[in-house]
Curated annotation (Swiss-Prot):
Lineage start: Eukaryota, Fungi, Dikarya, Ascomycota, Pezizomycotina
Family membership noted in the UniProt record: Belongs to the PAN1 family.
Native source organism of the sequence: Podospora anserina (strain S / ATCC MYA-4624 / DSM 980 / FGSC 10383)
Localization, UniProt: Cell membrane; Endosome membrane; Cytoplasm, Cytoskeleton, Actin patch
UniProt protein name: Actin cytoskeleton-regulatory complex protein PAN1
Membrane topology listed for this record: Peripheral membrane protein
Amino acid sequence: MYSNPNSFLGGNSQRPGQPQYGNQFGAGAGQPQLQQPGPFAPQPTGFGQQPALQQQYTGYPGLQAPQPTGQLQPQFTGFGQAPQQNVGAAAPPMPAMPQQFQQQFQQQQQQFQQQPQQTSSPFGAAPSQQPPASALAPPAPPMKPQPTGFHEMAASFQTAGGSKSTASAPRKTNKIPNIRLSFITAQDQAKFETLFKSAVGDGQTTMTGEKARDLLLRSRLDGDSLSHIWTLADTTRSGQLHFPEFALAMYLCNLKLTGKTLPEHLPENIKNEVSSMVDIINFSVAEEAANASDSGIRQNTATPPVIQHPQPQPSNSQLLQAQMTGFPSQQTGFLGAQPTGMPQATGYTGPRPPMPPMPTGFGSSLTPNAGPGGMVAPLNAQPTGIPGQWGLVNTPATGLPLIDALQARMMPQQGREQQTYTTAGLQGNAVIPWAITKDEKTRYDSLFRAWDGLHKGYISGDQAIEILGQSGLEKPDLERVWTLADNGNKGRLDMDEFAVAMHLIYRKLNGYPVPNQLPPELVPPSTRNFNQSIGMVKNMLHQESEYRKNSGAALLPQKTGVSYLKGHSFKGAGAGFGNRKDATVFKNNDEEVGYRSSARRRVGNNSPRPESPASVNSSEELSIEQLRKKIKEKQVLLDAMDFADEKHAEEDDILDRRDRREADELYRRIRRIQEDIDNHPDASLISADSDAERRALKRQLQNLTDKIPDLASQVRKTEKAIADARLELFRLRDAKAHPSSAAAIIGTGPGGTVTESDRLKARAKAMMQQRTAALTGKKIEVSNDDLDAPKRLEEESIKIRTEKENNERMVRDVEDSVREFAKGIEDNMKEGAQDSTTEHEKRRWEDGLGVEDEVRDFIYDLQRSSRAARIRSQDRQGGRQPTQEPTRAEAPPSARSVSPAVSRTSTPSAPVAGGGSYSSYKTPEERAAFIKQQAEQRMAERLAALGIKAPTKPGETAAQRMERERAERAAKLRQAEEEDARREAERQARIAEETGAPAPAAQAAVPKPEGKKPPPPPSRKTPKVDDRRAEEEAAARKAEEGRLERERGEQERQTRELEERAKDQEDELAKERAEADARLKALEEQVRQGKLKKEEEKRKKKAAMAEAKEQEAKLAQRRAEIEAARKREEELRKQLEALDVEDSSSDDDEGPEQITPQASTPTLGGSQVGGSQELEPAPPTPVPAPVQSPPQIVTSSPAETESRNPYFRMRAQAAETTPAPPAPPAPVAPPPPPQPDVSTNPFHRMTQAAAAPAPSGPVSRKRPEDDGWGSDKEDDDEDSDDDRPGQGAAHLASILFGTMAPPRPLSATGDKSAAASPPVTSPVASPPPAIPSPTAAGAPPAPPPPPPMPGMGAPPPPPPPPPMPGSGAPAAPPPPPPPAPGGAPPPPPPPPPPPGGAPAPAAPAGGRPAAFLGEIQAGRALRKTQTKDKSGAAVAGRVLD
């Protein structure tokens, strides 16, 4: 930081405002001293106007007599120069001066205790004790260090290091607060402290993420758990762990290891405990940093000084006091002659800067000498700690070489983008201080302003890459420079940070390494001040929290009077938290009335009531008039209080009366609603225990649902048995109809069934016989029945299987519909169920639990009236029941004869029989409809009783549902009106009974005749008149009843007629609907039969066409086989001797592999013809593409990815875009997604590195080996040939035809799944194809089949020379067998295959006319056929008819 390397002062010189006595005494005791040339004249040193400074014992021998010299005598002027060894005379060594030294020590010790800053007092008050002049000796060698005891005294003023200039800084130790963590034991905490200290070392308070990861990985937990543990433990989100956080991490690891679950969030007590201890650690670090001297921070790292604690300074005038002039001198240079009596400029009033240590321990000086001769060497300004003086020093004497060249290169220039910069011309070996000089700062600021054209105040990372890259340094060095300069990882540099970066680059160019950590000299003032501000805020918060905690404000804020008003100040300390008055500390003084708010008793238990201010004045001091006046005032107050109480009582009475009226009104409304509920038609459906009924229904529904799988499995078993029986019946009938086909294939399966292996063996046997006959010239009679039998069996099995699948699908649909219906019913029941809240409310308001007595009595009264009303309604219904029984047998029941639920839920379209009997329905459809209707009605009734809405009928339209609901509402309304009329009549009857008048119940129930007035009230005085009136009323009543009876009969007759008419209409509609359904079913049956017939015709036509084409293909192939057989006849004869035609071993299977021509292709098996519906279309052959190399995915840790260092991103991009070896273009791996939050979790990086996807291998483009073989029902129940060596059709086919070309596409057969296997068009080599499984062969076993067709059905080109198997040639029609290696000319090519992509079927030997074969051999051309391509593209599908 300081540019003057020769200004070495003692360690104690770092203490501002303190004289350097400790170091000087130490120097006198343990360092060689220079000799004093002579005494000094009196000097005004700022300590009063003392006439002369007497000689003092300073640990050095006495001074010589004054000797006039021509040079200025050495003065202590605050500036230390290099020592002059041969100046003046040396004093002789002095062994000991105990008496003087003792007095000097005592005086100094007293003055240090009293005035630590004023150092001139002890010397001014020292006695004038001087040694005799004769004690001075001639010059002698430098004095040796003597053990005078002063070294210990000097050391007492220092913290460590004694007087040695090379003393190191005090060793820091990890200060862990002596606080007990509650979530771990004391033994565990001690272990964790030991482990923490051993891991972080001395001088550190936090553990880095890397060390923490290494320690936590020893637990052998998975990465996810460790990542979660880190997230919980790192409470400060700093990427480092304090000790409490480390202990918490170990505690969480122990939890995980013991099998417990890690919490999602920390408990509050643990979190607060850890945070408090972390704050204590941080505050202790902040306090140490605040107490440490600024000079102790700004030191050269090579020689760390002893950090001293500064003492408070009274004023600037006391910074520099009188200096000791009798000390050993330092040669200040050859200055001009100066009298020794001249005053020296020691009264400098500016703040004294801290001085760097001097390794030799020589005497220190404080201020520069202001003599007239001037100074020999320039003095550098020392940093004073003021923000304006941030680490800036003067330019060293050697200057700043090459700084101009660096500035010129860094300036913005034209065409700089195309230039390549190196360090040539910028490197040097100059001595560069750590601190930034003033000249450097000026240049760097101008450079910053030149680049910051928009005056944004910062330079972004992209600009920094361009600017700093012009220095020519390596990118790793520039990356480290950026990391040091960009404080806080902001991604940009301000002016000071840019100066730091340029200074580091300039030092690097001069041979200095880039440091790992930014030294204190280069910390910008903005960063330092910001950190200090944060520390200040933390200290203030800590002090306030401590104050509140100690004062108990957190527990009783109103009791302690602690203010919550914000009073923080950054300029001065507050007077105290408790000295302010504001609203936050208001507290009602309960002691004024002598009561506590909590206990309601006198303060101080039995202590008397404290005197109030009013009682302080004694009553004796008041006169009688004053007392009367006070009495009158109190009387007025009491009257006012009484008046106020009366007023409040009246208001309360009014409110009580109003509340009573409202309560009575509510009671009346509740009673009315309860009466409506009791008299409602659906009141009888309310069950006392609906929950029990609901549970019973749920159990019944569950039992019915559990029976569904059993029924479905029984149906499936029956369907399977029916299918097996039908297939066996067809096999027997087919064997009876075609006897010759019965012995063609001998079944070896269970029960003699023909398995897949039997068919393959039979086909291989027939093929071998045909080839042998072709080679030997013999004829083998093969009947067409042998070839058609498997085809018929396969067709029948497909038909039976299709019907079985349809039936199974129907069963599944029934199961699904039943489950959905059951689920809907269960959901409706759950919606009507009561939870705990509703159950509590029900018990409260229905059972009267937890309510007031008045409300409970009212509830009980309602329940009693409800029960009475229900009993009366039941009695009334029971009384009317016999009178309506005859009408129920005669006519359909009216709305009153059936239950309300039935009349409400019945549909108008459903026919209703007289009496509801089941026998009235004649047809099964009507009976089924009646049963369904009755079931729906019962279900609706039970659901309505539970309060559940009935589900919508599946076959009911919206209009029908609306009509039904409208009818139900009308019926309900009509019934409610009747009930209201009846209830009103009953009420009038009760009123009449209570008043003693006759009950006019009948008159209230029916409409009264117009003009008739009610009879007058009875009179007790005239009994005869009353009797007469009663007789008249009885006669009128009888007449009225007769009229009403007639009207009722007329209405019932009309109603009966309407119902009969509606019934007839419904019957007619039902008949018409049944006839329409029958006609629709007949038409559907006709359409289905027509479709089946058409499909059968198409199938037969296609089969005939396929057979004809196969015949032609076999005919064309025979010619090629005859030509090939002539050359291999001898070889085949030898092999035929070892063949046993009847044997079914693997020898028969291996024969064709040796004799089959390489260019022949297998015929399509019957399984590909008949079982086309069972085959899944094979995937089309992909277009040939070059093999792609796996993409290289570059993964990085989150810390690297999230760093805003532009050079790091540049290096990462360079690593990603490094050219790989020449390879086909591969898809570029997507960059990792940006993460918004910087994660400092080291385990997060570990898990990301572990989760990086490994590059997959190259994708194979080869055709699958099986190529669809064995896919047509190899898992059939009848196939039990698992113990054969072939293990399936695919293996046997690969043995037989392993060397043949790829198979033809399925489109060549003309079947519905023609696009199942397209031709191989890829240039990639394909494996040898396998023969299709002949489960239901549609063609007879034939000699080697014809060549394959092109995939698109176009006529093929002439056959090229055949490729070797697996060579990857395109699937063109293969030629006849290849020529011999000797070079013999090949035979003529075979005739072109028939167009359309369908092979010609080969006719059986002996089955075709010999003349036709002769004509073909003679060269007769076949008739050109027209292509009718029905297969479409080889890669396209087809729609089945």
